[in-house]
Design a protein with these regions (language model features):
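Active-site histidine-anchored catalytic micro-motif
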Residues: 143-145
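Active-site glycine-centered loops adjacent to acidic/histidine catalytic or metal-binding residues
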Residues: 7, 114, 140
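A charged helix-plus-loop insertion that forms the helical arch/lid used to bind
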Residues: 78-92
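ATP-binding/phosphotransfer module of carbohydrate and carboxylate kinases, centering on a glycine-rich
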Residues: 1-64, 72-80, 99-107, 124-133, ...
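Acidic, His- and aromatic-enriched active-site or binding-groove loops in soluble protein domains
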Residues: 135-137
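A conserved active-site-flanking secondary-structure segment within enzyme catalytic domains
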Residues: 154-170
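General beta-strand structural signal in soluble alpha/beta enzymes
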Residues: 109-113
Length: 268
């Protein structure tokens, strides 16, 4: 069986085709081999979407899955289901992603946020394999959080927007915050643009600055501790450009344990 996948991002669209092997007979054990992949810059929708559709045309895919930057409408009964909604990327507001590819390709289209797609991948094949509840956090240009809870992706009033979790400030932080909606949310204080604006240099040029990463770990750990208390995940996966600073992992883990104060303890 041949399937298609799209990682729809604010700067690039990654489109891929995969072959699904089902020899083992168990749905959770299916393996997908990527046979073709292309990266398309995210320009205006009228330029980008036809290029994406053209990649899949004539390839014989039976279905397509889209993990998309947001916010997006995930309510199937909504007239705007499958749309990108109030994104800061003005040209992409109210763009019908599901409808566009359904019409172009004539196959079923699955649709969710990019981070929910990522956490689904982690529980299916990756670091959170076989977990009933897991969280995926990407820390880069923004902060996104995907939640897989009791065997299903979490939806509700909207999809999880836990990247905008409100935080207490680090006692030495005088930076106002990057988020235009919430001065002291996780994205506003810990995203890549926030790090650069606070310290005057991009994160990749600050690797040797202990004070930078102590403050970053403070904010990430504060959020992670709250996610542990709220969602009770068996695994939390951290990724994104900021997490290329590998020293952060141990710093965040130590700070999370400190914040939880022994109330919840798990060696993993």
């Amino acid at each position: 069986m041949r399937i298609g996948g799209i990682e729809a991002g604010g700067t690039k669209m990654v489109c891929a085709i995969g072959e699904v092997q089902t020899d083992k007979g168990q749905p959770g054990e299916n393996q997908v081999t990527i046979t073709e992949r292309v990266t398309i810059p995210t320009e205006k929708p009228k330029i980008t979407l036809p290029r994406m559709a053209a990649f899949f045309e004539g390839k014989g895919i039976s279905s397509l899955g889209i993990g998309c930057f947001g916010p997006v409408d995930l309510h199937r009964a909504s007239p705007t289901y499958g749309y990108i909604t109030s994104t800061p990327k003005l040209e992409w507001q109210n763009v019908d992603m599901v409808g566009t590819f359904t019409r172009a390709l004539g196959v079923p289209v699955g649709f969710d946020t990019d981070v929910n797609a990522a956490v689904l991948g982690e529980v299916t094949w990756g670091a959170a394999k076989d977990c009933d509840t897991a969280i995926y956090i990407t820390v880069g240009t923004g902060v996104g959080v995907g939640v897989y809870c009791n065997g299903a992706l979490m939806h509700g009033l909207v999809h999880p927007e836990a990247g905008h979790l409100l935080l207490q400030r680090h006692p030495k932080d005088t930076y106002a915050g990057k988020c235009p909606y919430h001065a002291n949310c996780l994205e506003g204080l810990a995203s890549g643009p926030a790090v650069e604006a606070r310290w005057g240099r991009p994160a990749k040029e600050l690797a040797d600055r202990e004070d930078v990463w102590e403050m970053e770990a403070f904010y990430l750990a504060e959020a992670v501790a709250n996610y542990v208390l709220t969602y009770s995940p068996q695994k939390i996966v951290l990724w994104g450009g900021i997490m290329h600073q590998s020293q952060l992992f141990s710093m965040v883990r130590t700070k999370v344990q400190e914040l939880l104060g022994g109330y919840i303890s798990n060696e993993k």
